Curated annotation (Swiss-Prot):
GTP binds at Q11, E71, S140, G144, T145, T179, N206, N228. GO terms for cellular component: cytoplasm; cytoplasmic microtubule; microtubule; spindle microtubule. Its main location: cytoplasm. It comes from Drosophila melanogaster (Fruit fly). GO terms for biological process: microtubule cytoskeleton organization; mitotic cell cycle; unidimensional cell growth. It comes from the Eukaryota. The modification N6-acetyllysine is found at K40. InterPro entries: Alpha_tubulin, Tub_FtsZ_C, Tubulin, Tubulin/FtsZ-like_C, Tubulin/FtsZ_2-layer-sand-dom, Tubulin/FtsZ_GTPase_sf, Tubulin_C, Tubulin_CS. This is Tubulin alpha-2 chain. Belongs to the tubulin family.
Amino acid sequence: MRECISVHIGQAGVQIGNACWELYCLEHGIQPDGHMPSDKTVGGGDDSFSTFFSETGAGKHVPRAVFVDLEPTVVDEVRTGTYRQLFHPEQLITGKEDAANNYARGHYTIGKEIVDVVLDRIRKLADQCTGLQGFLVFHSFGGGTGSGFTSLLMERLSVDYGKKSKLEFSIYPAPQVSTAVVEPYNSILTTHTTLEHSDCAFMVDNEAIYDICRRNLDIERPTYMNLNRLIGQIVSSITASLRFDGALNVDLTEFQTNLVPYPRIHFPLATYAPVISVEKAYHEQLTVAEITNACFEPANQMVKCDPRRGKYMACCMLYRGDVVPKDVNAAIATIKTKRSIQFVDWCPTGFKVGINYQPPTVVPGGDLAKVQRAVCMLSNTTAIAEAWARLDHKFDLMYAKRAFVHWYVGEGMEEGEFAEAREDLAALEKDYEEVGIDSTTELGEDEEY
């Protein structure tokens, strides 16, 4: 089996974890106590979900997941919530004092006290796997635990599980909706530290999700619950091919092979369609062509940036539901001719397709309508460098005055780390710039070969 272990870190990671596991359970017909009614198993015979759930002797299904936070309140909600019986108590790990939005606390002082407990628990989960495929790490960039502890754990996972792939789902600080003043510091420090340890990182920008909820679902004031359920749908689409048998399945390593042209350029942009409210769904027939087209609208992206200003390096379309290859090929052909999609000239073909016959599931009483088919597009585009540029600019404004730096230094960090991290991100922006340059312009340099 190709098992995946999910690691949910900090408040954002844990709350997205709640939304994801709620959805996985609905998709696989697993009850909140972990049991699967026998009538489901007779007809289905689909055991692909064991990539995400392990089964105990008593027939209970337990998520292959760890929830970690440096303070207990958020994880306590899992301990007392609807799904409290789903998880083994040891899978929910909490510290006593939080990281206080401080990367240095998450990474050095508070984080290092708990990291061995977490690794020990992950080791137990890994031992239950016959063929561990890799890790999915959920966290935010802005929080202290999400940034500091994640980067610490990723370093340790690289040491313990060198060849296993590590995918991140990172919550990028929203330009307008900020929860902490020091988010730019934390984001840049964590990106610098995790860059070499992560194989692929899907960024999700809270503000982009807010806008989608407002615009497509008519929710005036979206709560984190609304945001997380939408993010859950996207994560579910990305992982569906690992959990169901389909016509064109996509493996974890396959994502990297197709989406990551260079090790550092590993931040694909995710787009999901259709996001549609129950009222609207009655009146719309969402064809494959329509939802495919919607993926190229910047309004449906998970990160605020404009792909029309960048170039695509690779594009991965994951369909689920009532979709046949013929429709997909037609839709993609139309897009190639009509849309002004620019691919980098060294990567001419660029579309990878996955199809899963399991239609998208929605949480009962949620905001999203139940639809027959949906698509999640993962594209690696140079436009995502805009997101880094925004963060870097904010970092520079604060760092020029050395504002708030003493909090980090007081927790055992050296000021040099800030400069080092900032240089690394400047290099990352430069990498994106160079990747987008046409290769024909470099002919002058090739003469000596």
